Every structure is written in C-alpha cells, then in structure tokens.
C-alpha cells in the first residue's frame, strides 16, 4: 500500500513546485534545505514530509518524461 500524506503536505508541496519548479531536484537533502529557506515550517517532521513529497513528484515527473521520449522515438 502507498503512503498516506495529509492535505497540508500535498497542497504546500504542489504550490512550492508550481512557484519554484527549477529550485527542486530528485535529491531529498537538497529539497529539505530549499523548503527550509522558502517557508517557515513549525516542525522538522512536517518539513521532511513536504520535501519528501516534492522529491517523489520530481521523480514521477522525470519518469513520465522518459516514457514520453521513448514513445516519440518509436
């Protein structure tokens, strides 16, 4: 089964990705630092959840682009 994330994490992560798409990468540690710089998070756990979800979204986006490129090539 998948991970369950609260709406605050998903909403915040999507908003940050929409506003600053080039600042985030597939690296969790990098994303954690960027999240800390961009927003004031009350707890370390919440910051890590947001950074983890952003990392997940970037990986999914990268996989989707690879599949699209592969389909175009064929």
Curated annotation (Swiss-Prot):
It comes from the Archaea. Pfam families: Ribosomal_S17e. InterPro entries: Ribosomal_eS17, Ribosomal_eS17_CS, Ribosomal_eS17_sf. Keywords: Ribonucleoprotein, Ribosomal protein. GO terms for biological process: translation. One of its GO terms (cellular component) is cytosol. The keyword Ribonucleoprotein applies. NCBIfam families: PRK01151.1 (NF002242). GO terms for molecular function: structural constituent of ribosome. This is Small ribosomal subunit protein eS17. Gene3D superfamilies: Ribosomal protein S17e-like (1.10.60.20). HAMAP family: Ribosomal_eS17. Belongs to the eukaryotic ribosomal protein eS17 family.
């Amino acid at each position: 089964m998948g991970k369950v994330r609260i709406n605050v994490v998903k909403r915040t992560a999507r908003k940050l990705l929409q506003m600053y798409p080039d600042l985030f990468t597939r690296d969790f540690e990098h994303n954690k630092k960027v999240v800390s710089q961009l927003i004031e998070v009350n707890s370390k756990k919440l910051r890590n959840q947001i950074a983890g979800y952003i990392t997940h979204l970037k990986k999914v986006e990268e996989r989707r682009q690879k599949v699209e490129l592969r389909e175009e090539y064929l």
